[in-house]
């Protein structure tokens, strides 16, 4: 896949996640008993045979880069995370953290498109050559995917842009970017979070641009009255400009973890008889030395993902329990996510909740008959 530059947009604060996101970078929110949200897109890039992925971040970027450097760089032969203007100092610190980073000399970014512009010298190069395509990814999507087929179709079609999409129930489309295509698979409409959806297709938020075309539109939009956003500005401008934009359907599981209730609901999907993602399909980045098991039934645990080192003296039902957690004597956790090291006190009964590392409890919507997005 020479010529493809993978770019990972990692926002930051996770304000809509409530206590789960407080004091934590949203990309590093734990997921599935095995990983953090950002690890899924990184693992997909590695799985697709690409050599690296460029991290574009701003909010507490030192904290995020330090974490990813220790967790990912040096662990997978021939693959690493590129930190753009900071990358040289991280390369000089294999297996450890640099003492000091270069001073920031570029302006603050006001949106996803701004991130591409301000870091253009890193975005549009792949190794020592100019990139031919830019693969844009986000840090809060849960899915297992190989981008190879999408890249091949994009190149064969000579498209300016290929957007991923998925079919969902129309009542949920207003939460996403809505897309429509003609009979030849060409994009005809793109609307971010429409009030009155006319399609049941939504943008799955990863896309592949022809690099030269993307750069041209970014330069055209620079200095105009725009929102500095890929979905709200760049893609609509390309559509209005008559560019060839194709769609690529994502038929496997894909989830945008935008709110705490969607986060909690996504964990339920892991515990179904036909799980949305198998344990073996998820990156193992949180305490990777500790085995995990999907336990269908047994003493004190039923239909749950439980780490091998969990101290369980109670009852775990339909829950995901991370390494280092403790379930107290006669405690019951049902439909819960128990984060690493969390303690559930003796005699506590919890249902439809997230237990944070400090033991505080965040309640979620109780389970009801619903189709997952």
UniProtKB/Swiss-Prot annotation:
Protein residues bound to substrate: 177, 192-193
Disruption phenotype: Cells lacking this gene are unable to produce both validoxylamine A and validamycin A.
Entry's cofactor comment: Can also use Mn(2+) and Co(2+).
Keyword terms of this UniProt record: GTP-binding, Magnesium, Metal-binding, Nucleotide-binding, Nucleotidyltransferase, Transferase
Biological role stated in the UniProt entry: Involved in the biosynthesis of the antifungal agent validamycin A. Catalyzes the conversion of valienol 1-phosphate to GDP-valienol. Also able to use efficiently ATP as nucleotidyl donor, but other NDP derivatives are less efficient.
UniProt-listed InterPro entries: ADP-Glc_PPase (IPR011831), NTP_transferase_dom (IPR005835), Nucleotide-diphossugar_trans (IPR029044)
GO process terms (BP): glycogen biosynthetic process
UniProt-listed Pfam families: NTP_transferase
Catalytic activity: valienol 1-phosphate + GTP + H(+) = GDP-valienol + diphosphate
GO molecular function, one term: glucose-1-phosphate adenylyltransferase activity
Name this polypeptide is given: Valienol-1-phosphate guanylyltransferase
Family: Belongs to the bacterial/plant glucose-1-phosphate adenylyltransferase family.
Entry EC number(s): 2.7.7.91
Coiled-coil residue spans: none
Cofactor(s) this protein requires: Mg(2+)
């Amino acid at each position: 896949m020479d010529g493809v530059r993978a770019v990972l947009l990692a926002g930051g604060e996770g304000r809509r996640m409530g206590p789960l996101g407080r004091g934590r970078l949203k990309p590093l929110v734990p997921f599935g008993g095995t990983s953090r949200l950002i690890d899924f897109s990184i693992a997909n890039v590695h799985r697709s045979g690409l050599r690296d992925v460029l991290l574009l971040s701003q909010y507490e970027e030192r904290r995020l880069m330090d974490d990813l450097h220790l967790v990912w760089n040096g662990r997978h032969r021939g693959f690493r995370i590129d930190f753009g203007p900071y990358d040289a100092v991280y390369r000089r610190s294999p297996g450890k953290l640099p003492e000091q980073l270069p001073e920031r000399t570029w302006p603050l970014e006001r949106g996803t498109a701004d991130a591409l512009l301000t870091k253009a010298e890193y975005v549009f190069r792949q190794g020592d050559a100019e990139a031919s395509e830019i693969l844009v990814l986000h840090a809060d999507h849960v899915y297992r995917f190989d981008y190879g087929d999408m890249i091949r179709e994009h190149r064969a079609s000579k498209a300016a842009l290929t957007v991923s999409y998925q079919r969902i129930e129309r009542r949920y489309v207003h939460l996403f970017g809505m897309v429509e295509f003609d009979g030849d698979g060409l994009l005809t409409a793109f609307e971010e979070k429409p009030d009155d959806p006319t399609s049941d297709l939504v943008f799955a938020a990863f896309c592949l641009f022809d690099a030269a075309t993307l750069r041209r539109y970014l330069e055209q939009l620079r200095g105009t009255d725009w929102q500095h956003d890929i979905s709200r500005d760049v893609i609509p401008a390309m559509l209005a400009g008559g560019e060839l934009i194709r769609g690529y359907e994502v038929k496997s599981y894909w989830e945008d973890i935008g709110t705490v209730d969607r986060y909690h609901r996504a964990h339920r999907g892991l515990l179904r008889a036909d799980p949305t993602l198998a344990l073996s399909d998820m990156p193992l980045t949180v305490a990777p030395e500790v085995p995990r098991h999907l336990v269908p039934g047994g003493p004190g645990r039923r239909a749950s993902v439980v780490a091998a080192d969990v101290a369980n003296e109670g009852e775990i039902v339909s829950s995901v329990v991370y390494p280092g957690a403790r379930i107290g004597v006669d405690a019951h956790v049902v439909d819960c996510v128990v984060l690493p090291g969390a303690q559930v006190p003796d005699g506590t009964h919890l249902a439809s909740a997230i237990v944070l590392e400090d033991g505080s409890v965040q309640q979620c919507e109780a389970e009801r008959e619903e189709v997952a997005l």
